[in-house]
């Protein structure tokens, strides 16, 4: 019902959603695009509902993700984990319950101070530390000797004059490059985080390695690998990506 209201009544960024889907899947018919559009708004409604009831949402880690977390704890190394706006990305704030290592995530403070306070409080409830995006580089460089896991949502549009151009969903796309630059500067390991819905209110998080020594990689490799992995997640089930974001401008 909420999905119908958002997509059909409010028509929230409907034209952006349809245009993005058509650009990403030019081989699909109009009917097939509409099916993905409908499923997207239904899933968006679920994510919105879950974010209003975060205590009811459960996070599970795949076997490989648990192995990765355990290995990182033993190595006591710095790690950067990249993810996109796919599924309910807010559930990563529950990751501290699976590790003793400090966990951090970048965020952009909201202009409304009261809403920012509520958002900050909800996201840090389980021990996740939030770093304001504009200060993240300075903070992480200062703490580079401290083993930690830092999450970056890395599929935002960075502007045509910034970022790295990659082939993504049938078109040249500029990807946020700040995470890669930081990873190479700190010589961290880098991984890709994927989220899959399980039962209602349950998500499974998986981690796939991108590299162990970022400083040894060529420029753009990490970003291109991330884009490729995210594209595979989207192709598997397009309805969980945030199609209402003005990704291609």
List the model feature ranges, each with a label.
Residues 1-83, 118, 127:
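Membrane-anchoring hydrophobic helices of lipid-metabolizing enzymes
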Residues 3, 18, 92-93, 119, ...:
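Generic structural marker for isolated residues within well-ordered, non-membrane alpha-helices
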Residues 8, 54, 63, 91, ...:
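Generic structural "secondary-structure junction" signal
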Residues 21, 123, 182-183:
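Structural element of the ATP-grasp superfamily
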Residues 27-38, 71-78, 98-102, 134-249:
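Non-catalytic C-terminal accessory region of glycerolipid acyltransferases
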Residues 51, 87-93, 233-235:
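Juxtamembrane/interfacial segments around transmembrane helices
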Residues 77-134, 157, 161-162, 167, ...:
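Catalytic core of membrane glycerolipid acyltransferases/transacylases, capturing the structured
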């Amino acid at each position: 019902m909420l999905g119908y209201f958002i997509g059909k009544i409010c028509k929230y960024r409907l034209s952006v959603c349809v245009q993005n889907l058509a650009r990403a899947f030019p081989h699909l018919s109009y009917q097939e695009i509409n099916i993905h559009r409908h499923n997207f708004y239904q899933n968006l409604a679920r994510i919105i509902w879950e974010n209003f009831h975060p205590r009811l949402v459960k996070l599970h880690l795949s076997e490989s993700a648990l192995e990765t977390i355990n290995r990182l704890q033993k190595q006591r190394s710095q790690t950067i984990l990249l993810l996109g706006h796919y599924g309910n990305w807010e559930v990563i704030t529950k990751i501290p319950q699976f590790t003793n290592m400090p966990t951090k995530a970048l965020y952009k403070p909201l202009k409304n101070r009261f809403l920012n306070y509520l958002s900050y409080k909800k996201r840090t409830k389980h021990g996740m530390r939030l770093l304001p995006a504009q200060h993240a580089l300075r903070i992480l460089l200062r703490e580079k000797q401290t083993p930690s896991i830092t999450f970056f949502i890395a599929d935002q549009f960075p502007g045509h004059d910034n970022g790295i151009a990659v082939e993504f969903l049938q078109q040249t796309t500029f990807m946020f490059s700040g995470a890669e630059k930081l990873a190479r500067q700190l010589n961290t390991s880098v991984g890709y985080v994927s989220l899959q819905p399980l039962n209602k209110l349950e998500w499974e998080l998986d981690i796939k390695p991108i590299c162990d020594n970022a400083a040894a990689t060529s420029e753009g490799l990490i970003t291109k690998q991330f884009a490729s992995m995210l594209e595979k997640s989207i192709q598997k089930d397009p309805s969980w990506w945030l199609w209402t974001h003005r990704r291609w401008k």
